[in-house]
UniProtKB/Swiss-Prot annotation:
The keyword Translocase does not apply. Substrate binds at S11, R12, N13, R14, K15, K16, S77, F158, G159, Y160, D161, K181, H186, R187. One of its GO terms (molecular function) is nucleotide binding. This is dITP/XTP pyrophosphatase. SUPFAM superfamilies: ITPase-like (SSF52972). Signal peptide: none annotated. One of its GO terms (cellular component) is cytoplasm.
Amino acid sequence: MALVTKLLVASRNRKKLAELRRVLDGAGLSGLTLLSLGDVSPLPETPETGVTFEDNALAKARDAFSATGLASVADDSGLEVAALGGMPGVLSARWSGRYGDDAANTALLLAQLCDVPDERRGAAFVSACALVSGSGEVVVRGEWPGTIAREPRGDGGFGYDPVFVPYGDDRTAAQLSPAEKDAVSHRGRALALLLPALRSLATG
């Protein structure tokens, strides 16, 4: 009987977890069983005190691995807007001062960009994914370039998706199907870079 390796996805964000599951499942990684934080004993929240996405992703994966002994993957992601000097960056989820309030965060972002012309509204979604296991640590980064729309459009996705228009498209990320988003998104790109390490884990 083939051994099954348990992989802990260290996130409490259900929408992010679903996206991670879709991408990993779509890669056809046999031999891996995905677990969420809800499947293990309660873990303390890892504070996002890093100055980079990589710092935060690695801290979350390290904490999960240390607490459970399970190979753990974690993501930290956000939006970098050129006209705002790369902000909100690692502060994306709490840009308005209220953690996880997507509507408030988006409203503040649009207000800050209200006088910025279209040609200067460039931005990129960034995702850093970290894998920590008994074999070591791997950290990768994916970016999804685009621009910021002037008003929200679409009901899909989460976070800043309704105002992010990927280069080469006229729809926002919130107007893409899950499959379309997974194929091109920052998280999808980061996970694609992580797949060799995950395959080694599954066959190890």
